[in-house]
Amino acid sequence: MAQHAVYFPDAFLTQMREAMPSTLSFDEFISACQRPLRRSIRINTLKISVADFLALIAPYGWSLTPIPWCHEGFWIERDDEEALPLGSTAEHLSGLFYIQEASSMLPVAALFADDNHPQRVMDMAAAPGSKTTQIAARMGNRGAILANEFSASRVKVLHANISRCGIANTALTHFDGRVFGAALPEMFDAILLDAPCSGEGVVRKDPDALKNWSPESNLDIAATQRELLDSAFHALRPGGTLVYSTCTLNRQENEAVCLWLKETYADAVEFLPLGDLFPDADRALTPEGFLHVFPQIYDCEGFFVARLRKMSSLPAMPAPGYKVGAFPFTPLKGREALHVTQAANAVGLLWDENLHLWQREKEVWLFPAEIESLIGKVRFSRLGIKLAESHNKGYRWQHEATIALACPTHAHAFELSVQEAEEWYRGRDIYPQTPPAADDVLVTFQHQPLGLAKRIGARIKNSYPRELVRDGKLFTGNS
């Protein structure tokens, strides 16, 4: 594999020599950093099983190598990347897989280790959504996830990925993560803090990642990480699990941050060793039981993962100073709720008791039940999924609800051909040889929902959101 020139500050190399265990070769570390990163994907098991996905893509000639710490994760090699980028394939557009670096699948694997089944989870630094969507898949779209992102520009990307993957159990917030310990004390069964860091592990993807690196900046970042971890630990219920991770390699931002928490809260903190997380995990194991993944160990990005348990309750942090404001939604119950549910079921949209109906003026939403106890304690950027807008003639069903809730075997489902599916993704109306009988049509391809549409005569009117429309080649193997 070709190498690329990575910028290494001298002080960084000195620091790595000191941090690296004697069992690892420093020359192999440098060599690994200079190799381009292997691409990897994670199959979205909310939409398709691993076996069915592998059968679906078998004719494409994609070479998939299993990632040992993630059953649904694979390194991928393709010959047609230039003609058809992976992110433009129909399987990606319909949410069947997520393009995710292999190392970044580790934190969620750790969060759910030892048969852990949390019902309310927080992803404290969630964008662009790889770990949030992985958590949702592990939860089977049940329970609830609070996905927080401090960067306003990244919240939109986070929502787009959640929507594409058909996720219904998530609430989005836009806060500095340091507020949650005070705002939502001991409210979560599990928390993932994939902390902002110096990014030393990403040089295989970005050869200039260390251009602005300095030992001083590492210490500044570690101070912020301690505050975020402190907040996360306060927001975790006693007995709950917290995973702290970074994509950096120095000890100040990794082991030292976790040891600081242990020193601060003593017996309230238990380190849960990760040596049995997957075969050969012990090759990256630290004396504390953390995983310090140097890139040459598994031929992936550099990464760090620690798993902690909260053993006892902590004194509350000072109450937050902000005002949440009035909540603009009201529960939809009784006859109204029944009417909405029956109308949705009639077009193939189904949900269970995990989701509750709420209303804001003419908008109808579905909120995860597990998140309702947080209402009034924190301001949400977006909560649950928008199901419909009501109008004089009924309901206008929303695209994100169709992707998350539609039953592809419903009587109104209409399976598109390859050519028709390409037309759909390009935003064009469909003229099938044999039009569907029903006026309300659940459009599917590869037995996955693409949207709800109206039949007008012999034409299926395209309802694909304009902002998602794609041009160019979208399918592997067709002309």
Curated annotation (Swiss-Prot):
Gene3D superfamilies in alphabetical order: 3.10.450.720, Vaccinia Virus protein VP39
Predominant cellular place of this UniProt entry's protein: cytoplasm
Amino acids binding S-adenosyl-L-methionine: 125-131, 149, 176, 194
Name the CDD domains on file. AdoMet_MTases (cd02440)
**Known EC number(s)?**
2.1.1.178
Location of this chain's protein in the cell:
Cytoplasm
The cross-references to PROSITE patterns, in alphabetical order and at most eight, read: NOL1_NOP2_SUN, SAM_MT_RSMB_NOP
Q: Sorted alphabetically, which Pfam families does this protein's record hold?
A: Methyltr_RsmB-F, Methyltr_RsmF_N, Methyltranf_PUA, YebU_pre-PUA_dom
Q: Which GO terms describe its biological process?
A: rRNA base methylation
InterPro entries found in the cross-reference section: Methyltr_RsmF_N (IPR031341), MeTrfase_RsmB-F_NOP2_cat (IPR049560), MeTrfase_RsmB-F_NOP2_dom (IPR001678), Nol1_Nop2_Fmu_2 (IPR027391), Nop2p (IPR011023), RCMT (IPR023267), rRNA_ssu_MeTfrase_F (IPR023545), RsmB/NOL1/NOP2-like_CS (IPR018314)
- The active site consists of 247 (nucleophile)
Task: Please give the catalytic activity noted in the UniProt record.
Answer: cytidine(1407) in 16S rRNA + S-adenosyl-L-methionine = 5-methylcytidine(1407) in 16S rRNA + S-adenosyl-L-homocysteine + H(+)
Provide the alphabetized UniProt keywords.
Cytoplasm, Methyltransferase, RNA-binding, rRNA processing, S-adenosyl-L-methionine, Transferase
Purpose: Specifically methylates the cytosine at position 1407 (m5C1407) of 16S rRNA.
Q: Which family does it belong to?
A: Belongs to the class I-like SAM-binding methyltransferase superfamily. RsmB/NOP family.
PANTHER family noted in UniProt: 28S RRNA (CYTOSINE(4447)-C(5))-METHYLTRANSFERASE-RELATED, NOP2 YEAST -RELATED NOL1/NOP2/FMU SUN DOMAIN-CONTAINING
| Protein's name in the database | Ribosomal RNA small subunit methyltransferase F
